[in-house]
């Protein structure tokens, strides 16, 4: 039978004692309490020892009780002064009592019949009575003395003198449960103990042991790597935040430039008009977007850019006939929380880009929706675009698939034809979630020339807008999008780290 060093030492000492209190066994072995308890439990599992436990309710002194045991109960201190002087005022009592003790003790002296109370010249006077002169030790005094002598006394013993609730009421004593442990050797333990050879175990192989050759003489401690241990929850990043940081880092490593963002609020010009989305499009109504009550309107960019966008809408650019309506600058000036990250792509293109160039942003967007496990009204979106001479639709599909497979960990991805006012051709990307089935991630396409030429770009631009929250559901293995922003401590502790 294989025993650790602590188990061997504990068994040898227990064989000498046969039966001992746990504290006695700790003293005999010279080991720490934790080490002895681990050894006893190990010996018990091997049938070599038995651990007996008996729980009992006891009473011990509080800090207030310890003070009273040393200087006396307040009523006895007050009575001693009364016996010396015959009668006292409240100011006199303050010589021996604290302000907290004064009021209740005056009432107690009166209740016990140890003093009479009267008013004289506007002052409260206490005068000792015959009963006060003859007062003797009471049950509470004997209980206090017993607790001071023994430190810990069983409840049943205290109850013979006074109810424990009375000690609690006066904050003299407190009740707790203590467990007395006794360890006993078994016949199998008695048989094995004389045969045990006690060798000091070594838990670390040091250079000195190797050089001296003493490693041949020592016994190495065995470790059970499967033994259960206390779980530790070290500090870590919020899981979703860690995922976003990983995405950002990965895109930068791939050569993308992160677009800077000034505000969550945009004009409809950047949300829609600059993207060649007509002002009568249903997606611009209150059912699909939020609007600001105050301030209601913002400012349009430089006049030349506004004029090109207006022309694209009314008459068309790059061979297009446009949307054929009268474009309203007042409508374009209306303010709203950003409805999609593509608004930032439009801003960046108008500001100027490197050609070829790759750009991205991870931003909060807002849309009216019904909250459920796959929809939020405020969520994060990753938008990006690549601009270059030779770009085509196949490049776009390759980038999207790489996103879903490599970054989100999706196993199956599919693309469906779609329609967006500002891209042509357009595509919708979905990935398969083991719990939710096919989940839409977002849309993508090649920006229409009516949009890019109005913004001053003459080469192809492939772009996408992806719900990064849904990508995170795959990577973090959750089936409810609301968990990404959860305060659930258990989920925050146990959610896997994303690298």
From Swiss-Prot:
> What domain of life does the UniProt record list for this protein's source?
Archaea
One of the entry's Gene Ontology molecular-function terms is: tRNA binding
Chief location of this protein?
cytoplasm
Q: Which cofactor does it need?
A: Mg(2+)
List the InterPro entries. Answer: aa-tRNA-synth_II (IPR006195), aa-tRNA-synth_II/BPL/LPL (IPR045864), Phe-tRNA-synth_IIc_asu (IPR004529), Phe_tRNA_ligase_alpha_bac/arc (IPR022917), Phenylalanyl-tRNA_Synthase (IPR002319), WH-like_DNA-bd_sf (IPR036388), WH_DNA-bd_sf (IPR036390)
Q: What's the short name of a Pfam family annotated to this entry? A: tRNA-synt_2d
Q: Where does the record place a coiled coil? A: none
Indicate where this protein resides in the cell.
Cytoplasm
Question: Which processes are annotated in GO (biological process)?
Answer: phenylalanyl-tRNA aminoacylation
Provide this UniProt record's keywords sorted from A to Z.
Answer: Aminoacyl-tRNA synthetase, ATP-binding, Cytoplasm, Ligase, Magnesium, Metal-binding, Nucleotide-binding, Protein biosynthesis
Q: What is its EC number?
A: 6.1.1.20
Q: Where does Mg(2+) bind?
A: 424
Query: Mind naming one GO cellular-component term on file for this protein?
Result: cytoplasm
Listed under catalytic activity are: tRNA(Phe) + L-phenylalanine + ATP = L-phenylalanyl-tRNA(Phe) + AMP + diphosphate + H(+)
What family classification does the UniProt entry report for this protein? Belongs to the class-II aminoacyl-tRNA synthetase family. Phe-tRNA synthetase alpha subunit type 2 subfamily.
What PANTHER family does the annotation carry?
Answer: PHENYLALANINE--TRNA LIGASE ALPHA SUBUNIT (PTHR11538:SF40), PHENYLALANYL-TRNA SYNTHETASE (PTHR11538)
Question: How is the subunit organization of this protein annotated in UniProt?
Answer: Tetramer of two alpha and two beta subunits.
Matching NCBIfam families, A to Z? pheS (TIGR00468), PRK04172.1 (NF003210)
> What is this protein's name?
Phenylalanine--tRNA ligase alpha subunit
Q: Which organism is it from?
A: Thermococcus gammatolerans (strain DSM 15229 / JCM 11827 / EJ3)
């Amino acid at each position: 039978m294989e025993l650790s060093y602590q188990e061997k030492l504990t068994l040898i000492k227990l064989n000498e004692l046969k039966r001992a209190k746990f504290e006695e066994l700790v003293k005999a072995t010279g080991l720490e309490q934790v080490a002895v308890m681990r050894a006893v439990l190990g010996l018990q599992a091997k049938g070599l020892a038995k651990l007996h436990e008996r729980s009992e309710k006891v009473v011990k002194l509080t800090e207030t009780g310890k003070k009273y045991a040393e200087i006396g109960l307040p009523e006895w201190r007050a009575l001693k002064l009364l016996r010396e002087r015959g009668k006292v005022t409240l100011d006199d009592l303050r010589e021996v009592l604290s302000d907290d003790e004064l009021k209740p003790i005056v009432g107690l002296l009166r209740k016990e019949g140890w003093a009479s109370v009267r008013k004289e010249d506007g002052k409260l006077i206490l005068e000792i009575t015959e009963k006060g002169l003859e007062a003797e030790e009471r049950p509470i005094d004997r209980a206090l003395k017993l607790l001071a002598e023994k430190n810990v006394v069983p409840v049943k013993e205290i109850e013979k003198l006074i109810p424990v609730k009375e000690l609690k009421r006066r904050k003299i004593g407190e009740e707790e449960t203590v467990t007395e442990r006794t360890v006993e050797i078994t016949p199998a333990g008695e048989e094995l103990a004389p045969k045990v050879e006690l060798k000091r175990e070594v838990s670390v192989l040091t250079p000195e042991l190797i050089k001296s050759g003493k490693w041949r003489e020592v016994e190495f401690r065995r470790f059970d790597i499967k033994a259960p241990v206390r779980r530790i929850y070290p500090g870590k990043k919020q899981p979703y935040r860690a995922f976003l940081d990983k995405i950002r880092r990965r895109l930068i490593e791939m050569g993308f430039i992160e677009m800077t963002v000034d505000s969550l609020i945009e004009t409809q010009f950047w949300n829609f008009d600059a993207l060649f989305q007509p002002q009568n499009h249903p997606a611009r109504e209150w059912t699909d977007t939020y609007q600001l009550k105050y301030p209601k309107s913002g400012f349009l960019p430089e006049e030349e850019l506004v004029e090109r966008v207006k022309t694209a809408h009314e008459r068309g650019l790059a061979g297009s006939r446009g949307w054929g309506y009268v474009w309203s600058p007042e409508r374009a000036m209306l303010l709203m929380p950003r409805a999609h990250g593509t608004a930032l792509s439009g801003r960046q293109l108008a500001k100027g880009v490197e050609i070829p160039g790759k750009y991205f942003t991870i931003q909060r967007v807002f849309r009216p929706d019904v909250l459920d496990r796959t929809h939020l009204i405020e969520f994060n979106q990753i938008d990006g675009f690549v601009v270059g001479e030779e770009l085509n639709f196949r490049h776009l599909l390759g980038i999207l698939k790489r996103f879903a497979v490599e970054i989100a960990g999706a196993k199956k991805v599919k693309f469906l034809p779609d329609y967006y006012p500002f891209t042509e051709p357009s595509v919708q990307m979905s990935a398969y979630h083991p719990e939710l089935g096919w989940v839409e991630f977002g849309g993508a396409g090649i920006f229409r020339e009516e949009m890019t030429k109005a913004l001053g770009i003459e080469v192809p631009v492939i772009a996408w807008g992806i719900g990064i929250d849904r990508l995170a559901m795959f990577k973090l293995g959750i089936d409810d999008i609301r968990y990404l922003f959860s305060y659930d401590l258990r989920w925050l502790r146990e959610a896997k780290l994303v690298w």
